[in-house]
Regions:
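Helix N-cap motif at beta-to-alpha junctions
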Residues: 49, 227-229, 274-281, 330-334, ...
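Conserved glycine-rich FAD pyrophosphate-binding loop
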Residues: 2-4, 39, 64, 71, ...
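N-terminal glycine-rich anion-binding loops that anchor highly charged ligand groups
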Residues: 20-35, 66-68
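A generic structural motif
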Residues: 103, 266-275, 359-368
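Short glycine-biased active-site loop of nucleotidyltransferases that positions the nucleotide triphosphate
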Residues: 33-36, 75-81, 260-263
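A charged N-terminal "starter" segment
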Residues: 1-22, 26-27
Length: 443
């Protein structure tokens, strides 16, 4: 895009693919689709998979960068060097098939999480996908990020609920992996490479997903403890027991201030959500006994879990300069990881709120400046460095939210993966010219 004629040519080619009305060029629209402040040259909204393939093919041939986008609700990654094209998937929003008897549903990537939830709920079924903004969030975006919420404990990671994907590779080829039903999923599981690859290997265009019978009823049991060690001991007791909760969460005293209901005491909280018949929930009440300090059900329960899911959003709304980190460690290392986070926060004049899945040890850590106001960038950089240095080598520590000026001084992803050669080989095979999401992910 060095000359005026080249720009006119690209505009014409983009418009020929999607139609002039779906080529967005106004300054205000382009600004709304900026990525970490980097404004795109063009925003396009394809309506079919063929249009997606044609757009990626054009970008590949013209050596342009292309960034897939869903509902803009969970963008994570490094600041891109430049953004030529943002490809918005929200016009690809159909439910292609739904078979309640087989517990499967096929949806286009731009379908909203809310619309799919509502479709399966009409048949008393459940899609275990939880995001802070289900109306704008898209299925493709959730898959690209491998996003999950509290239901991850009971239903497993999202990749286990994905039966098949259709996608467009970095050179514009339409492809698929997996199938429509469980028995058809065989061979090399390429789709599991795409889930969580943040759009750097391919543009996801459609997905076949497993759904689950919705529980007859749910009830949430809350246990408050004076110390972190007591909360971890309770977690261990639950994990060793016959109980199989849908959700099993932990929250620090500060994290609870962002929930819809919290204790006024400085206590650590463990939350279990049980689903099933009256007999099942009665079993939980009996087995948990005096450890339970609160019980939520019906509307109060829904409000409570929505606030837990919205934790990162609520922190950012109240503290715009906060830094939120997604942390994953071995379950046996959870207490140590939290204690390290609290120590490095204190050393750098920060507060830290912890909330997340305590059985699988996947947490959100919200670092908040103290006193309130704009933090010194070095505070966050030093805290993040010390946190990563103090954790096991296999721990994952990813910055999911921070101010732009902070991102310029920290590595969002952390240390380069040990299997980087294999990752580069996959990238070369699917996106050899580095068209997709350039500069955003670990490679």
């Amino acid at each position: 895009m060095n000359t005026g004629s080249a720009i006119i040519s690209i505009e014409s080619e983009l418009a020929a693919i999607v139609g002039r009305e779906y080529l967005r060029e106004s300054a205000s629209v382009l600004a709304r689709h900026a990525i970490d402040g980097v404004v795109p040259e063009y925003v396009v909204e394809p309506g079919t998979e063929d249009e997606v393939a044609a757009l990626v093919r054009l970008a590949n041939e013209r050596k342009l960068t292309l960034y897939p986008e869903g509902g803009r609700t969970g963008q994570v990654g490094r600041t891109p060097p430049r953004v030529d094209i943002v490809l918005v998937t929200t016009r690809l929003n159909t439910i292609e098939h739904y078979d309640p008897g087989d517990l499967t549903i096929g949806v286009a990537a731009g379908a909203s999480v809310l619309s799919v939830r509502e479709a399966v709920a009409a048949n008393n079924q459940l899609l275990p996908v939880e995001v802070a903004h289900p109306a704008p969030s898209t299925i493709g975006g959730v898959l690209a990020r491998a996003a999950y919420g509290p239901l991850r404990h009971g239903y497993g990671p999202l990749r286990d609920s994905c039966l098949g994907l259709r996608f467009v590779t970095g050179d514009g080829r339409l492809a698929k992996s997996g199938g429509r039903v469980v028995k058809n999923v065989a061979g090399y599981d390429l789709m599991k490479l795409l889930i969580g690859s943040h759009g750097t290997l391919a543009v996801i265009t459609a997905a076949n997903l497993k759904v689950y019978p919705a529980p007859q009823q749910t009830r949430t049991f809350v246990a408050d403890f004076a110390s972190l060690s007591e909360a971890i001991a309770f977690r261990d007791t639950v994990v060793r027991s016959p109980l199989t909760p849908m959700c099993l969460e932990i929250a620090s005293p500060l994290a609870q201030e962002f929930f819809s209901s919290h204790s006024d005491r400085q206590t650590w909280r463990v939350m279990l959500r049980a689903g099933g018949s009256d007999a099942v929930t009665a079993r939980y009440a009996r087995d948990l006994g005096s450890a339970v300090t609160h019980v939520f059900e019906a509307q109060a329960e829904e409000q409570y879990w929505n606030s837990v899911i919205d934790f990162g959003e609520r922190v950012s709304a109240r503290h715009q300069n906060a830094m939120v980190v997604a942390l994953s460690v071995a379950p046996s290392e959870l207490q140590h990881a939290i204690e390290v986070a609290e120590r490095v926060a204190n050393e750098n004049n920060l507060l830290v709120a912890c909330s997340g899945r305590c059985a699988i040890a996947a947490l959100n850590l919200a670092f908040i400046p103290m006193p309130q106001g704009a933090p010194v960038v070095t505070q966050y950089a030093q805290a993040l460095t010390r946190l990563r240095e103090s954790l096991a080598p296999d721990a994952a520590c990813v910055v999911t939210r921070c101010a732009d000026q902070v991102k310029q001084h920290v590595d969002v992803w952390g240390a380069t993966a040990t299997d980087v050669d294999a990752m580069r080989a996959v990238k070369r095979a699917l996106d050899g010219n580095d068209v997709l999401n350039r500069g955003r992910f670990v490679l």
